[in-house]
Amino acid sequence: VQWAAEEKQLITGLWGKVNVADCGAEALARLLIVYPWTQRFFASFGNLSSATAVLGNPMVRAHGKKVLTSFGEAVKNLDNIKNTFAQLSELHCDKLHVDPENFRLLGDILIVVLAAHFGKDFSPDCQAAWQKLVRAVAHALARKYH
């Protein structure tokens, strides 16, 4: 992926304001609520029977933070995203058997969460840069599948 200087600035500038715990928890919770079939990968998390249960589930919150913390590695390594996610791609493919389409869905959900949290600061140019980033991360995570 080739990044313009402006794209890098938009991504890193916004990332510096992101509350990883809150945004990560919200993104994973939204994924599980909006796309309920993704819950099958989180059976060990206990009660995911309703939106209220998902939103209040401490395991969802903790894993959401872990996911978004990992996403931060992409922000730090914009020019080497494929290698940054090589091990996670292998884990999700070989051991967890996650449908790679779910990575794209989570990326789209993250865009919604960022827009909700940052409003006007999440300008169309900023959204375009972040959309490019979430696509690159989803592609890197799906790499082991091909």
UniProtKB/Swiss-Prot annotation:
UniProt subunit comment: Heterotetramer of two alpha chains and two beta chains.
Gene Ontology MF, one: heme binding
Binding-site residues for heme b, renumbered to this chain: H63, H92
Protein family according to the UniProt entry: Belongs to the globin family.
Keywords: Heme, Iron, Metal-binding, Oxygen transport, Transport
Name of this chain's protein: Hemoglobin subunit beta
GO biological process, one term: hydrogen peroxide catabolic process
InterPro entries per UniProt: Globin, Globin-like_sf, Globin/Proto, Hemoglobin_b, Hemoglobin_oxygen_transport
TM annotation in the entry: none
Record's signal peptide: none
PANTHER family associated with the record: HEMOGLOBIN FAMILY MEMBER (PTHR11442), HEMOGLOBIN SUBUNIT EPSILON (PTHR11442:SF7)
Functional summary from the UniProt entry: Involved in oxygen transport from the lung to the various peripheral tissues.
Keyword Heme annotated: yes
Reported tissue expression: Red blood cells.
Domain Globin residue range list: 2-146
Claim: Transport is one of the keywords in the record: yes
Top-rank taxon, per record: Eukaryota
Pfam families per the UniProt record, alphabetical: Globin (PF00042)
One Gene Ontology CC term in the entry: haptoglobin-hemoglobin complex
